[in-house]
């Protein structure tokens, strides 16, 4: 059983943090030759709107709206060989990197050879 693909799903409220982290990941790819990087792929921005009353007692018509935007990108890393250490070594480079304000979800895809 070996890792064939790794998907990084990146989410942030701040678009600049998201762009900087994607640039850092793409910059570190230069060291490894056996990996194919696809992305960053922009996913739809989720907008959550919250409406509140301006005054606590009267004037129901007077309201204020706030919104929270969640930006999402994904990067896919594929291994060109059956060596699983390439993807793991690539991911260990970011183990000590701190991305403040960034949510990272890592999904690994495995493949198993069947001998008949």
Swiss-Prot record:
It is found in: Mitochondrion. The keyword Electron transport does not apply. Its main location: mitochondrion. GO terms for molecular function: structural constituent of ribosome. Keywords: Mitochondrion, Ribonucleoprotein, Ribosomal protein. One of its GO terms (biological process) is translation. One of its GO terms (cellular component) is mitochondrion. InterPro entries: Ribosomal_uS10, Ribosomal_uS10_dom, Ribosomal_uS10_dom_sf. It holds the Pfam family Ribosomal_S10. Gene3D superfamilies: Ribosomal protein S10 domain. The keyword DNA-binding does not apply. Belongs to the universal ribosomal protein uS10 family. PANTHER family: 30S RIBOSOMAL PROTEIN S10 FAMILY MEMBER (PTHR11700). This is Small ribosomal subunit protein uS10m. It comes from Reclinomonas americana. The lineage of its organism: Eukaryota, Discoba, Jakobida, Histionina, Histionidae.
